[in-house]
Design a protein with these regions (language model features):
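Accessory helical-bundle/CTD segments and flexible terminal tails appended to RecA-like ATPase motors
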Residues: 167-176, 183-190, 195-198, 213, ...
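Inter-lobe coupling/hinge segments of SF2-like helicase ATPases
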Residues: 6-9, 13-242, 306
Length: 325
């Protein structure tokens, strides 16, 4: 049997009574959206003593996951090409002061018969944050481009209104969909060719790359993503935005994310943060780690007499080792 369920249906606390008699394989899509404990809970839902096989799929591995592939705790397979007919999304980084200049681009895109996502990090204005909200942006777009059909999608709308606007956008009845990160996964509109992301400095690399992937899904279409930022921008945020501008491959972006945020706890729950190595650097020394793993495998396959000679040569009388039984 195959069971297909959403993350929330399987992982929340009141689902502890869900168990499988013989769980053999777990396939997790959009793995970056799951926490460490959630993935562990999934694997522990089998009544069998054998650990089920696990296949994780993601366009942008989180730092901890990428580090686990480096330490050989996870086997890695990479699809390093786009689906047939798709072109990379061209990305530009612009100050929020350039908003008016974008209107001309919006009008051209929609005149050519294509559609636009305009993404905001907040639904409503908040005096505590200097950010553009979805509701304010919708008003601004309607004021500056009244001929274009624009609507909202965010989590505070009723399910009926949200679904109607999404369906209308898919059917080409809406030119500009002003939205929040609710459209990060599950939206496939091949006619959408432009993504505007307000206050992009507030979002992480993985999420920005996922959002950018909502456009460029049509065959042989030139698509664009504009990352708008609000000054002042931290050095870390500048590096994130430049990485999105430079790289289109999710694994390249994940490596930058690993360098910027750290690998987290390989044996704990943190999925990012520094590893307290005193000398080694996990990103810089990844090739050395692979070499050491290769040598370790070769040594472990040696005959016991040769292995004992090597251990004695390297360790001598300073260490005591116990031969595995």
């Amino acid at each position: 049997h195959i069971v297909v369920r959403r993350q929330r249906q399987m992982c929340i606390r009141d689902r502890k009574n869900i168990e499988f008699k013989s769980l053999a394989l777990i396939v997790v899509d959009e793995q970056q959206r799951f926490g460490v404990k959630q993935r562990f809970d999934l694997a522990s839902k089998s009544q069998s003593e054998e650990m089920p096989h696990q296949l994780f799929m993601t366009a942008t591995p989180i730092p901890r996951t990428l580090a686990m592939t480096i330490f050989s705790d996870l086997d890695l397979s990479i699809i390093d090409e786009l689906p047939p007919g798709r072109n990379p999304v061209k990305t530009v980084v612009l100050s929020n002061d350039k908003r008016l200049e974008i209107v001309n681009r919006l009008q051209k895109v929609c005149k050519d018969g294509n559609q636009v996502y305009w993404l905001c990090t907040m639904i409503e204005d908040n005096d505590s944050f200097d950010v553009q909200s979805a509701e304010t942006s919708l008003e601004w777009i309607r004021e500056n481009a009244p001929e274009l059909r624009s609507e909202l999608v965010h989590s505070k709308l009723s399910n009926e209104e949200k679904e109607k606007n999404i369906i209308d956008f898919r059917n080409g009845l809406i030119d500009i969909l002003v939205c929040t990160t609710v459209i990060e996964v599950g939206m496939d509109v091949p006619n959408a060719s432009l993504m505007i992301i307000e206050n992009a400095e507030r979002l992480g690399l993985s999420q920005l790359h996922q959002l950018r992937g909502r456009v460029g899904r049509g065959p042989n279409m030139d698509s664009y993503c504009a990352l708008l930022y609000q000054d002042p921008v931290s050095e870390n945020a500048q590096q994130r935005l430049e990485a999105l501008k430079k790289y289109s491959n999710g694994f390249d972006i994940s490596e930058i994310d690993l360098e910027l945020r750290g690998a987290g706890e390989l044996l704990g729950l943190k999925q990012s943060g520094g590893i307290d190595f005193k000398i080694s650097d996990i990103s810089r020394d990844a090739q050395l780690l692979k070499l050491s793993q290769s040598l370790t495998e070769r040594i472990s396959n040696l005959e016991s007499t040769k292995l004992e000679k090597l251990i004695d040569r390297w360790i001598g009388q300073d260490q005591v080792y116990i031969k595995a039984q």
